Every structure is written in C-alpha cells, then in structure tokens.
Amino acid sequence: MMMILSGFLAKLKGNMNKVKPIGIGLLGAGTIGAGVINALEGKSDLLTERIGRPVKLMGILVRNASNHHASSNIDLPFTENAEALITSDDVDIIIEVLGGEHPAIELINLAIKSNKHVVTANKEVMAKHGMALLHNANKEGVLIGYEGSVGGGIPIISALTHQLATNEISAVQAIINGTTNYILSNMSAGGASFNAALNEAQMKGFAEADSSYDVNGDDAAYKLAILSSVAFRSAIHDVDVFREGIESIGPEDFIYAKELGYCIKLLAISKLEGQFVRARVHPSLIPMDHPLAQVNGVDNAIELEGDLVEWSMLQGPGAGSGPTTSAILGDLINIGQKLDSAGLKPNNIEIASKYKSLPLDDLETKYYLRLHVKDLPGVMAKISRVLGDMNVSLATVIQKEIDDEAESTAEIVITTHKSLEKSMQNAIKQLKSLDVIKAICS
C-alpha cells in the first residue's frame, strides 16, 4: 500500500511540474514583504499541495532594484517598474504590502483593471477605499483578499464572511493593535513609564521607529472601520471612528486601576444602535475577570455578539511579520484554489451604506479621571459642584498626597456613574478653569 501511494505522490509531483504556475507579483519588500518572500520559498511544496498548482514569484516591486540585488543572498526578480509587473500576462495575483495609502491604492486599482486578483494587508487603503475596491473587483470579476489588514494571526474576515455569515452581528469589542497592547501590558506588569515601555517594544521589533500611528489610535481605528464594515455589511469610514491614544497614560493609572479592580486596555468598540453605528477607539478600564483583561503582550482579541452565536471571541498574535504573512498566504491559497474553477465568479462581499455613524456626544458610559490639585480645604467640594452641575455623578473618589516641593499637591482619582460624553467633556472644560486644578492627567 505504501509503495503504491508513494508512486502516486511521485507521479502527482511530476505532473505538477508540467502545470503552468500561478504567477505572483509582490509589491513591497519591507518587513512583511520579506516574510512573504521567505514563506513563498520555504513553503513552496506546501503551497503547491494546498492549491493544486505551483506558485512562482514573477516580480518584486522595490524603489531601488540595484540595492536589493546587491544585498540579496539569492537571485530574486526585483523591479522598479510597477506597471509592467502588474499588467504582465505571467502574473495572476498581486500581493500588496507597501503600506500607506499612496501609491498602494493606485496600484491596487491598476491590478483590478488589469484583471488581476489582489491580496493586501493594507489597513489604511481598506479602511478608506475598501467599499469601492470590493465593488470594482466584483465588476471586473476578480477577488480581493484582505485578511491581513485587521487581526494579524486572527482569521476574523474569514469568520465573518463564512462561518458567522448567517449571524446578525450587533457589536464588536476588540484589542486590535499589538504594539499598544504590548506597551500597556508592560506598564501594568512592571510599572514602566510609557516611554520606557515604548522603547522596549521598539527594541524587540514590536513597534516602529515612528510609532505615532499605533499609539495615537490611528492603526486601531483603521482596523475597526474594516472590521465594522464587514461585520455590519455597511460602510464605516475611518473618519467616523473616534480615536484617543495611550500617550497620556502613566504608571499611576495602573496602580489605581488595580485598586479599583480593573486593568487598562486600548479598546476598539463598535455597536449597532437602531439604524446607526457608533465606532470608537480609546483606553478603557476593563474588569479583571473579563476575558479581554487576560489578553497581554502583542496578542489581539476580537469579541463579537451575534443573534445565533450569541458571543464569540477569537484571539491570536497581532504584531510581527509572521502573523501577517500567515494571513496573506491564507488569502493566496483561497484565491489560488478558485483560479481553475469553471466560470469563476467573484464572491467579494458587497458593503452598502445601510447605517449612519453616530457621534460620541450622546454616548452614555462610565468615566475615570486623574487630577493633580492644590491640597487645600474645599477643593473636592469645588470639583463635585462642577461635575454635579454637568449631571455627572461620582461613583468613587481616591485622594492621596504627592510630593511637590513647590506647594502642597494632592492626586485625586474619580470614577463616575454612567454619564453622557458631552456632559463629561463640558465638565472637563469647567474643571480646567478652576484655580485649584493643577493638571488633568488622564
């Protein structure tokens, strides 16, 4: 039996060598691009087995082909001519890992018009232009895979478009930025400052040299826009996602959070509210016993609420080239398996404009404030009066003296009962005008 099977496999492999390979055009050779190149080379037999046809890298778009040729240990087909690569008859699938909006969007559009299937991990492009790209791809009869644009190693797009497709998703709550989750986990566990935790993340390769895109919430907002659009089948634009980063969070906040029974995470939240969607990214206090509180390091996790599944959570690594490469190759296999299907029809989901976006003003939730104030009699009464006038009700108050050689200073931490966002923002404006307030820290 083994001899017959081995002979069959050998014959199958021999036949594969006669089959026209699937041509791949790779746009970009940075960290993710290098991961894709290595995987295409190292997993060529596995890809052939999974797809049923061999895969061949026909060209790699870079800015300076000479430099790449000089520094590469193996002979690779580097090119600076994007149009020639994308429109080549030998290329079937374009993998875009350039990052950023331009020139990526123009090149993806060229690929679609040239009847090429596309795999991209570009969160900014998909957040800003995803609806139009999917529509145009359907019109041209090509597929777009974009699993790598959201959850790293979490196959969330596949889950939403296939396994959970019969669910009416009503809410998404997620940790979807590995860099910020690593920073916050480090600050929580070791008491590190924000800058120290960021530096460590950069040293370990979990954060870019310029990490503002991550720490200010933009990266998570792009991902939430994509995730919400797919989950609700309605276009949620990145500009409609409120975002607040983690730069103002200090080690003290983690001490107080633990004292109150919480941990701090950068959450991405979107919910259906009637015919509206409210999407937001901001630091949040999560109860210690909540599943998301256990998601640490570079891991991501995505919670979904659906009418059939009720509740589901997917978790996996969210930073580094490995998880994104895994998602890209998964999309490549999915498209590759369909290339030989008779009468291939594109099955990109169409994202309509069913729901309008809600601003944050009338959001009702609980709040946390940390203040530095002059340590004088009557200060708390003034703060309480301002909050009360704005219909913000106090839940807990912690006050501690802090060292300040210039003058006596106290640190006050306040949590509130559910209050309107606009009421809280008005209260903060009023608090800043009080002469007893030295700083609103977070």
What are these regions (language model features)?
Residues 332-442:
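A conserved regulatory-domain signal marking ACT and ACT-like small-molecule sensing domains
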Residues 104-110, 123-160:
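Rossmann-fold NAD(P)-binding glycine/threonine-rich loop
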Residues 156-169, 180-192, 222-236, 331:
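Oxidoreductase and adenylate-handling cofactor-binding alpha/beta cores
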